[in-house]
């Protein structure tokens, strides 16, 4: 009797392969060559790193958004004897995300640039591993509609939303009342300024804002954590992912970042997901779901941790969190405007053009000025994003620090 045919490897497209989430995804893939293979790897402009990844993982496709960088990569791979086909431009991101031969898509491109390929993967019915916040913040209704209509499988990668997903009943059909879900509790570390005097926040430097106490992250998301806008965006995401109203989503400051989030049920039970702060855990969970695989993560030692602390968020210290709740309640284009204004304000702060405490001021002023924008299709969403950025830039100029 012949041996059974081994199962086909799952083909994984990694959008944003050279970023933090992309590299962690490839780390997990490399640990399980018997289960997964890289189908397509994409990047914005990082030729050298993508070249190295192509030699290591031999994907069928490599995509660089920058055409000159793509030409450079194509020549280098050809000289190295690689069979990887190099594609260029934003349209190529959409093509590989929706490619019929790909099984799963890690959507890890940061910012509005990641929206179109993530939406394409959802419309193509893929298993979508969603790490791109903007897909839901900018286009929550549109994105979830695409998931439902295509039968795509949506698995959240943010550690908080992945924790909520794990604490919900398997097969949860976005019906909290039927499942007895009372509240979703999103944990937040509180960032580096949880205990710093409010008066001194105006003097915060970019390096201080990027020094997160628990997680290793990029500079933009580190600033978002310092302002707690990151948690505000996650509140909006949770609303769309789990169909929970804003008043049933509570943020809990938990400095140790051991409990990644919780779900409270009607019978009084609270289910929590715990683990060391390592993004490979939610990535491995989503790749193998409903099975469990090794992620290379150090086991959690509760005795080493000793105790867990919880606090209410301080909305005076963190006005960005309040702005996010307000945008979610307002609906329409408010969340898209919030996100665009935040990206522009954070970029200006990192360039030392505005102070740290100016970030929420710029966002609030942009929300006030950029109203009545449409978000009923992807073109309208991107237009609202662009118009909000124009307004935010004018608000930045009005507050810009003189050299």
Swiss-Prot record:
Organism: Aromatoleum aromaticum (strain DSM 19018 / LMG 30748 / EbN1)
Reaction(s) the record says it catalyses: 2-C-methyl-D-erythritol 4-phosphate + NADP(+) = 1-deoxy-D-xylulose 5-phosphate + NADPH + H(+)
Protein name in UniProt: 1-deoxy-D-xylulose 5-phosphate reductoisomerase
Broadest EC class assigned to this enzyme: oxidoreductase
Binding residues for Mn(2+): 158, 160, 234
E.C. no: 1.1.1.267
Biological role stated in the UniProt entry: Catalyzes the NADPH-dependent rearrangement and reduction of 1-deoxy-D-xylulose-5-phosphate (DXP) to 2-C-methyl-D-erythritol 4-phosphate (MEP).
Binding-site list for NADPH: 18-21, 46, 132, 134, 218
Highest taxon in the source lineage: Bacteria
HAMAP family xref list: DXP_reductoisom
Known cofactor(s): Mg(2+); Mn(2+)
Family the UniProt entry places it in: Belongs to the DXR family.
InterPro entries: DXP_reductoisomerase, DXP_reductoisomerase_C, DXP_reductoisomerase_N, DXPR_C, DXPR_C_sf, NAD(P)-bd_dom_sf
UniProtKB keywords: Isoprene biosynthesis, Manganese, Metal-binding, NADP, Oxidoreductase
Gene Ontology biological process terms, A to Z: isopentenyl diphosphate biosynthetic process, methylerythritol 4-phosphate pathway involved in terpenoid biosynthetic process
Pathway participation: Isoprenoid biosynthesis; isopentenyl diphosphate biosynthesis via DXP pathway; isopentenyl diphosphate from 1-deoxy-D-xylulose 5-phosphate: step 1/6
Binding-site residues for 1-deoxy-D-xylulose 5-phosphate, renumbered to this chain: 133, 159-160, 189, 212, 225, 230-231, 234
UniProt GO MF annotations: 1-deoxy-D-xylulose-5-phosphate reductoisomerase activity; manganese ion binding; NADPH binding
């Amino acid at each position: 009797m012949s041996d059974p045919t081994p199962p086909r490897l799952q083909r994984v497209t990694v959008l944003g392969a050279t970023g933090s989430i992309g590299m962690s995804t490839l780390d997990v893939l490399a640990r399980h060559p018997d289960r997964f293979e890289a189908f397509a790897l994409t990047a914005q402009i990082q030729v050298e790193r993508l070249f190295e990844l192509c030699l290591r993982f031999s994907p069928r496709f490599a995509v660089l958004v920058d055409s000159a960088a793509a030409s450079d990569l194509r020549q280098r791979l050809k000289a190295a004897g690689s069979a990887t086909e190099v594609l260029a431009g934003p349209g190529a991101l959409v093509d590989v995300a929706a490619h019929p031969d790909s099984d799963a898509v890690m959507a890890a491109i940061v910012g509005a640039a990641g929206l179109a390929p993530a939406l394409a993967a959802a419309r193509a019915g893929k298993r979508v591993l969603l790490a791109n916040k903007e897909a839901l913040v900018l286009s929550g209704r549109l994105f979830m509609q695409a998931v439902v209509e295509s039968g795509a499988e949506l698995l959240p990668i943010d550690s908080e939303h992945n924790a909520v997903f794990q604490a919900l009943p398997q097969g949860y059909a976005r019906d909290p009342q039927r499942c007895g879900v009372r509240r979703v509790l999103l944990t937040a570390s509180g960032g580096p300024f949880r205990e710093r005097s409010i008066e001194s926040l105006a003097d915060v430097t970019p390096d201080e804002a990027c020094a997160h106490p628990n997680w290793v992250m990029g500079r933009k998301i580190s600033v978002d954590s310092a302002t707690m806008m990151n948690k505000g965006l996650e509140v909006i995401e949770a609303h769309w992912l789990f169909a929970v109203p804003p008043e049933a989503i509570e943020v809990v400051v938990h400095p140790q970042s051991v409990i990644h989030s919780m779900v409270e049920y009607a019978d009084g039970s609270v289910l929590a997901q715990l683990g060391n702060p390592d993004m490979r855990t939610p990535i491995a969970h989503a790749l193998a779901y409903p099975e469990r695989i090794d992620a290379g993560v150090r086991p959690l030692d509760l005795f080493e941790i000793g105790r867990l602390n919880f606090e209410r968020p301080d909305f005076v210290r963190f006005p960005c969190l309040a702005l996010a709740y307000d945008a979610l309640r307002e609906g329409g284009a408010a969340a898209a405007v919030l996100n665009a204004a935040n990206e522009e304000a954070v970029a200006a702060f990192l360039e030392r053009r505005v102070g740290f405490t100016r970030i929420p001021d710029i966002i609030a002023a942009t929300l006030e000025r950029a109203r009545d924008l449409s978000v009923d299709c992807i073109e309208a969403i991107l237009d609202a994003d662009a118009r909000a950025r124009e307004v935010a830039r004018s608000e930045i100029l009005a507050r810009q620090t003189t050299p």
